[in-house]
Amino acid sequence: MAHYHNDYKKNDEVEFVRTGYGKDMVKVLHIQRDGKYHSIKEVATSVQLTLSSKKDYLHGDNSDIIPTDTIKNTVHALAKFKGIKSIEAFAVNICQHFLSSFNHVIRTQVYVEEIPWKRLEKNGVKHVHAFIHTPTGTHFCEVEQLRSGPPVIHSGIKDLKVLKTTQSGFEGFIKDQFTTLPEVKDRCFAAQVYCKWRYHQCRDVDFEATWDTIRDVVLEKFAGPYDKGEYSPSVQKTLYDIQVVSLSQVPEIDDMEISLPNIHYFNIDMSKMGLINKEEVLLPLDNPYGKITGTVKRKLSSRL
């Protein structure tokens, strides 16, 4: 039978690397009413706090613990007091509240994602209080702030599915004894975009306009001109083009990470049915899938 040593306070064989606790997926719908014209923000927020002491871990002493239920209530109260102008501003408000209210909180991390509601509109007329859920990319942000420093803000896009039926190929790759993939000059190209960028300065930044700009760049570089498209020789090239254009158009951001899971669509062989299928009927395959990633940052000389 194993024997367990209970006097953990004398254990000098381990040390803390990082600690934190908090509340995940705190959901809020905030309604801004300007007469009969209403605006909404629905968000899911996760908060992590790091404390200056470790006595809760070492000794089970909870005297420094801010209950996670209190963290949840604080998120709700800040939505009431501050509103949600942007998810980035809301996350910064949460960080600064805990750092200013509790001297023993030394680090805050807040993740917020926005549920994609869009105001109903018809013939250029916007509805005053009705919205439709439009899953065309989720806006999220991550804000971290230490007691001794300013907030570090990342924003991003996820769950943005895109597909084009031509103007994509894949040729010239390495072939060995295990290669069965044929070269192709024309194929479907589909991906689920994950894109995250870091702001090097946040003063007077319009976070929502920046998000819209980068989302537009993603779509424009993926699709190309509306009348003819733009050829993509590889997922990697499209990924890099998105990053270069984004950093050139948005001077407030310093780096950008993109992940493009390559969603495969394969031509279905109908020859046994006596049919010729010329890339008209394709089979979507969820797994396995290719995953292409890349992170770029501004060169130091370009920041000066």
From Swiss-Prot:
| Enzyme's top EC category | oxidoreductase
Which residues get modified to N-acetylalanine? A2
Locate the N6-acetyllysine modifications and list their residues: K10, K23, K27, K36, K118, K122, K164, K175, K185, K221, K228, K278
Give the GO cellular component terms, alphabetically.
peroxisome
Where does this chain carry the motif Microbody targeting signal? 302-304
Origin superkingdom: Eukaryota
Q: Which residues carry this modification: Phosphoserine?
A: S39, S63, S232
Please name the catalytic residues of this protein: K23 (charge relay system), T68 (charge relay system), H264 (charge relay system)
Positions that bind urate: T68, D69, F170, R187, V235, Q236, N262
* Chain positions found as N6-succinyllysine: K10, K23, K221, K228
The family database entries (Gene3D superfamilies) matched by this protein are listed as: Urate Oxidase
* Protein's GO biological process: purine nucleobase catabolic process; urate catabolic process
Function, in words: Catalyzes the oxidation of uric acid to 5-hydroxyisourate, which is further processed to form (S)-allantoin.
- Give the record's family classification: Belongs to the uricase family.
- This protein's name: Uricase
Q: Which organism is it from?
A: Aotus trivirgatus
| Gene that specifies this protein | UOX
